[in-house]
């Protein structure tokens, strides 16, 4: 039975056919003024087989959201997937996949050098007790270890 087309791009992705980790272009939108928004699916864990624990995911979200902007001014957002298998990276007016891979690599290398999770306090975070620098660094290290596979989505 054919699955009906959904409005959300990721709901149309056959999650049984992908091979994490990977980075893929999930969507492109052209604005009425000509701006281009590109959303990347940055998958760390194999869907329906593995997931990131919440404190590690939460800490990696904070670290990457802060650090990636040191490498790219066109980043709009870095947000976690509810399924806890990856993140979405959204950029403005930038459509160079190879450069995105490079800034992700640099960012993950910087995560490994971090000495604290940024904004992991009650004033700046809604769940400040839910962080682990070590867990975030383990996720970044595992992702970097598979750098050669990031372009192999499997679909």
Swiss-Prot record:
Transmembrane segment boundaries: none
Record's catalysed reaction(s): S-(5-deoxy-D-ribos-5-yl)-L-homocysteine = (S)-4,5-dihydroxypentane-2,3-dione + L-homocysteine
Residues that bind Fe cation: 58, 62, 125
Enzyme Commission numbers on file: 4.4.1.21
Gene Ontology molecular function terms on file: iron ion binding; S-ribosylhomocysteine lyase activity
Keywords carried by this UniProt record: Autoinducer synthesis, Iron, Lyase, Metal-binding, Quorum sensing
Pfam family, one: LuxS
Superkingdom of the organism of origin: Bacteria
An example Gene Ontology biological process: quorum sensing
Co-factor remark: Binds 1 Fe cation per subunit.
Needed cofactors: Fe cation
InterPro entries registered for this protein in UniProt: LuxS_sf, Metalloenz_LuxS/M16, S-ribosylhomocysteinase
PANTHER family, per database record: S-RIBOSYLHOMOCYSTEINE LYASE
NCBIfam families: PRK02260.1-4 (NF002604)
Subunit and partners: Homodimer.
Family: Belongs to the LuxS family.
Function field: Involved in the synthesis of autoinducer 2 (AI-2) which is secreted by bacteria and is used to communicate both the cell density and the metabolic potential of the environment. The regulation of gene expression in response to changes in cell density is called quorum sensing. Catalyzes the transformation of S-ribosylhomocysteine (RHC) to homocysteine (HC) and 4,5-dihydroxy-2,3-pentadione (DPD).
Name the UniProt record assigns to this protein: S-ribosylhomocysteine lyase
Annotated source species: Helicobacter pylori (strain Shi470)
This protein's encoding gene: luxS
């Amino acid at each position: 039975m054919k699955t009906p087309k959904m409005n959300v791009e990721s709901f149309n992705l056959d999650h049984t056919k992908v091979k994490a980790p990977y980075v893929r272009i999930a969507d492109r939108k052209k604005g009425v003024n000509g701006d281009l928004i590109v959303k990347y699916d940055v998958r760390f864990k194999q869907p329906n087989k593995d997931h990131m624990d919440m404190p590690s995911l939460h800490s990696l979200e904070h670290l990457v959201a802060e650090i990636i902007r040191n490498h790219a001014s066109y980043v709009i957002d870095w947000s976690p997937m509810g399924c806890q298998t990856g993140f979405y990276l959204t950029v403005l007016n930038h459509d160079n996949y190879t450069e995105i891979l490079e800034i992700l690599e640099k960012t993950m290398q910087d995560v490994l050098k971090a000495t604290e999770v940024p904004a992991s306090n009650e004033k700046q975070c809604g769940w400040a007790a839910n962080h682990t620098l070590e867990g975030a660094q383990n996720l970044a290290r595992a992702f970097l270890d598979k750098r050669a596979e990031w372009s192999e989505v499997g679909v």
